Amino acid sequence: YQMMEEAGIEITWESQQKFREEMRVKEGQDFILKRVIKNMRQLIDAGQKKIIMDGLYTWSEYKILLHEFPGQVTVVAIVAPKHLRYQRLQNRPERPMQPREIKERDCSENENMQKGGPIAIAEHFIINDGSLEDLHAKLDELTQATHFCKSPMQC
């Protein structure tokens, strides 16, 4: 959002999709990740040992993360049944979407952004088919099972 705001672009679903796709054509599929890696390196330099990154979208981004952080990347895919995902996207308070827009976004994300690859190779999957509290509980369980955190209070 920051780059769009700096460019004076109104933030809508359509403008976000167009902006991301144009930037990926202009600067490469991994343009966002390059900026994120810089921030991650700053966190590491400041002493941070474990970092959670949200929004791994493309296969190119996945390969870059493996190269930048060899042996340190674990991918967790959080997925929801299609009907529930559509319902949530239509009913969300910020930027709700119509079914047509959701279908277009799904096609765009798979065809133009290679989004299926990172999901397919994930080491862990969380099925997000309940409440937000249920999702948080599943995330807490996973962070403990993978020794990312010793307890939810330490994350």
Describe the residue ranges of each PLM region.
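Short, acidic/turn-prone active-site loops that include or flank metal/cofactor-
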Residues: Y1-Q2, I78-H83, I102-R105
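A short, charged, Gly/Pro-tolerant segment at domain boundaries
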Residues: P152-C155
